[in-house]
Design a protein with these regions (language model features):
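Active/binding-pocket-proximal capping segment
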Residues: 365-368, 376-377, 598, 675-678, ...
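Active-site mouth of glycoside hydrolases
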Residues: 94-98, 121, 137, 149, ...
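Secreted/periplasmic carbohydrate-active enzymes, especially glycoside hydrolases
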Residues: 1-345, 475, 584-585, 614, ...
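Substrate-binding clefts and catalytic carboxylate motifs of secreted carbohydrate-active enzymes
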Residues: 7, 13-17, 161-164, 411, ...
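Beta-sheet entry/capping signal
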Residues: 79, 111, 344-345, 367-369, ...
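Extracellular/periplasmic catalytic domains that process cell-envelope and extracellular macromolecules
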Residues: 105-106, 303-304, 401-405, 493-496, ...
Length: 810
């Protein structure tokens, strides 16, 4: 690879990207360190050339009528040359590009050149021409280039508009014909599943086929082999119209059942010879969105195999700014942490790129339903005839590639555009509103009706159903709620709303100090308001906002490490307020998808897992508040009423109301215990009650008034027991944490085999176990505990150099 102006050739990996090649050969500094992002961005003012010489042996393709050069992904604008002949120009990162090259290939050595054009120059020229507006955190003109928008900067992402050949390049030989697409539809009825194959065959020119003795498409047929999860194979010959699966094993989301997968193989045959094969794994399930008018408005819930399921998860963004660093193993690790935290859903946000096949393979295996946005976000687009043709093929390519996956729950038109276009945000001319409707309510539905009519389509997120009909209506469809954080409202604000499906809501925190130390080598920069820390905070004023919320809840930390710890507790408690409230109101609300799961670089953001895969407090909280059976407390306290203690009539209610929610297909009988305790954990009052919790339900207990409780020196603990084990627990205080009179819990920690044991002499709030030497993932962390011992299993990592702290230490 080289900068074509400098002709400084360096080795490059394919699949790969320009930045990764430059970084590996010392041609650029780490773009994540300090403000090196500026230097990295400037490098993309240039054009770059990839060049390779490969051997082509005619004997390997002797039976082929045509040879295709296939690019699964080029980022983004490129000219492609084979042996000096221009094959074409490409301009869409999200498409698959194929070129017939049979007549250009030479037996022996061949030269392939791909010239990647500057995305910055293209966007600048397009903006000058069209003046379209979009997200202010990104490069002007980003909407005119079918490139992952986050690369141009976002309010959590660096501006690193990389380029390259980020997916495989292959030579495909076609003998007589090939399978253009295979669509396996499912019919679920009376406990049986029928598979209905729709097979499209692309034939080579009939004259060429006849010259080889075939009679074109008339001589072609396909055979289907279905391999059950236990390995049993069933074969259907002669182009079957349908295949009945006996004793079908259904696929379920995580927490509701298993994820058995059937392998379907379609062999295209010309006579007795197999000329092409399609092989994928599918899950047998009926999956759609349930919408029904009700007393509050209209329901919006995932319906799986006849059951309405509460969606629990987070919004997924691309895993790295440098795509060469992504891998199946890295994605597996991230999605495994979702399963560990009891997710059943992830939403793929529309400002990135359509995920790799392996992303969906892993979601199929792990039981994670995928809300899949089309790749449009926070902008308006110029719908020229050329742009329309380009995105239509983009839709076709990705729908055909992903539609067979069991985990694909719905397609969604875009991120936040219906809402903002209705408000007039970014709109500069009337045609932009018309074009919006054409794109998301005509073009995409047309393509889906042809290529994937069985998957539910939703026009935007948020939306109430489209056509600018009150998007973000709390009583219909999905909602993005940002009054907490962007609107500076307190966490108690969450409890004022009963959204049908919350697909975005969030709160920021700092990642671990260990993560932040990778972006600076100056200890003075480890300060919330230093240049480097604010350079790695892309939501303007975000660090100050964290501090503002912090002063309301906690005493101001004395050091940076405690500041990071307190910021993570704020984030975790804020999202907990929302999720527990939504789950307590199951039936009315049927989804809690927080913003966001992950990061694409080391940054202060809304994520629950940072760039290096380290869990923040929020991810441990998520493991608890997404538990299949969860006990939670709706308390009334000083915090919930936002009372001012300096007012003349300062008073507030002190009460608890417990709730058990059950997101399983089994009824549960649980013993709920609660107690009023002093700060040394001594019990002052305790009660218990057996509770029957039906399948897929939330059950309230009676409200308990606690007018005499000392809000500075007493707290309530609560536990849910089943089969003599605690399955869910927590505590609640009735003042702000900064006012509560915590005793020194005298925390001590030791290792006992594969467990860590924490001992406390008094009530300890939000106990953090951390390892200064190695990354740890634990069965539980950032937990509340009464006096005594608490044992936590080690899931990953080595427990060397353990430290422990609680809110008392802030």
């Amino acid at each position: 690879m080289c900068n074509i102006r400098q002709l400084d050739w360096i080795p490059a990996q394919i699949p790969g990207d320009i930045y990764a090649a430059l970084l590996k050969t010392g041609k650029m500094p780490d773009p994540f360190f300090g403000d090196n992002e500026y230097q990295a961005k400037a490098l993309m003012e240039e054009d770059y050339e990839y060049r390779t010489v490969f051997n082509y042996e005619e004997a390997q393709f002797k039976d082929c009528q045509e040879v295709i050069l296939r690019f699964d992904g080029i980022d983004t604008i490129a000219d492609i040359y084979l042996n000096g002949c221009c094959l074409g120009k490409v301009d869409n990162m999200h498409r698959i590009w194929e070129f017939p090259v049979g007549e250009l290939l030479e037996n022996g050595k061949n030269t392939l050149r791909v010239i990647i054009r500057s995305p910055l120059k293209f966007m600048a020229e397009a903006f000058k021409k069209y003046k379209n507006r979009g997200n202010e955190d990104t490069i002007e003109g980003f909407m005119h280039l079918r490139k992952a928008h986050y690369m141009c900067g976002w309010d959590w992402g660096a501006c690193l508009p990389d380029g390259g050949i980020f997916r495989p390049v292959t030579l495909l030989g076609i003998e007589t014909a090939r399978l253009d697409s295979v669509y396996i539809r499912q019919v679920h009825k009376d406990g049986k599943v029928l598979l209905v194959p729709e097979v499209d065959v692309e034939t080579v020119d009939e004259e060429e086929s006849e010259a080889d003795g075939y009679e074109g498409a008339q001589a072609l047929e396909y055979q289907v082999t279905v391999t059950a999860p236990n390995g049993t194979k069933t074969i259907w010959d002669d182009c079957p119209d349908e295949m009945e699966i006996e004793n079908p094993q259904l696929w379920w989301p995580n927490g509701l059942g298993e994820q058995p997968l059937y392998q379907v193989q379609v062999d295209l045959k010309a006579g007795d010879k197999i000329v092409d094969t399609w092989c994928r794994k599918i899950g047998l399930r009926a999956l759609t969105m349930h919408r029904e008018k009700d007393q509050w408005g209209e329901s919006f819930a995932h319906e799986v195999n006849g059951y309405q399921v509460f969606a629990m998860g987070a919004d997924y963004i691309p895993e790295d700014n440098l795509l060469q660093r992504t891998s199946r193993e890295r994605t597996r690790e991230l999605l495994l942490q979702c399963k560990r935290a009891n997710f059943n859903t992830v939403r793929v946000w529309g400002g990135g790129y359509y995920p790799e096949d392996w992303f969906f393979d892993l979601c199929d295996e792990l039981g994670l339903m995928v809300w899949q946005d089309f790749m449009f976000a926070c902008s308006v687009y110029e719908l020229t005839p050329e742009f329309e043709a380009n995105i239509r093929q983009e839709f076709i390519d990705n729908i055909k590639r992903l539609r067979h996956h069991a985990s694909l729950a719905l397609w969604c038109g875009n991120n936040e555009m219906e809402m903002f276009v209705k408000q007039g945000t970014w709109v500069t001319k009337p045609t932009e509103m018309r074009d919006y409707l054409f794109m998301y309510e005509r073009i995409i539905p047309e393509v889906l009706s042809e290529y994937d009519p069985d998957t539910f389509y939703w026009p935007a997120s948020p939306s109430s159903g489209g056509s600018f009909d009150e998007p973000n209506d709390p009583n219909r469809g999905d909602v993005h709620y940002w009054e907490v954080w962007h609107g500076n409202k307190p966490f108690s604000e969450y409890r004022k709303y009963f959204f049908r499906y919350a697909s975005e809501f969030g709160f920021q925190s700092f990642p671990s100090v260990k993560t932040l130390e990778t972006v600076t080598d100056d200890p003075k920069e480890l300060n919330p308001f230093s240049y480097v820390m604010e350079k790695h905070q892309r939501n303007y004023g975000g660090n100050g906002k964290i501090a503002k919320y912090m002063q309301a809840a906690y005493r101001y930390p004395e050091n940076f490490s405690d500041f990071v710890y307190a910021s993570q507790l704020l984030q975790a408690d804020g999202i907990r307020y929302g999720v527990e409230h939504y789950r307590r109101n199951r039936g009315r609300c049927m989804g809690a998808i927080y913003w966001q799961l992950n990061d694409c670089w080391p940054v202060i953001s809304w994520s629950s897992i940072d760039y290096y895969g380290r869990w923040k407090a929020l991810h441990y909280y998520a493991k608890r508040f997404f538990a299949s059976v969860m006990l939670s407390c709706e308390e009334q306290s000083w915090m919930t009423v936002e009372a001012d203690m300096n007012r003349q009539h300062f008073e507030f209610e002190k009460s608890i109301r417990l709730n058990v929610t059950n997101e399983t297909l089994d009824a549960h009988r649980v013993l709920v215990k609660w107690a009023v305790r002093k700060t040394d954990a001594t019990i002052l009052r305790e009660e218990e009650q057996w509770l029957e919790v039906p399948v897929l339900s939330a059950v309230w207990m009676d409200k308990v008034e606690l007018p005499q409780i000392d809000c500075f020196n007493e707290y309530v603990s609560y536990e849910a027991w089943e089969n003599d084990q605690i399955i869910s627990q927590g505590t609640v205080i009735f003042s702000y944490p900064k006012y509560f009179h915590y005793l020194n819990p005298g925390l001590a920690v030791r290792v006992d085999g594969d467990e860590i044991v924490v001992k406390a002499e008094a009530y300890a709030k939000s106990v953090e176990i951390r390892n200064e030497n190695d990354d740890l993932i634990l069965e539980d962390n950032y937990f509340d505990m009464n006096a005594g011992e608490y044992r936590v299993k080690i899931l990953d990592g080595k427990p060397d150099g353990l430290k422990v702290r609680s809110v008392y230490d802030i």
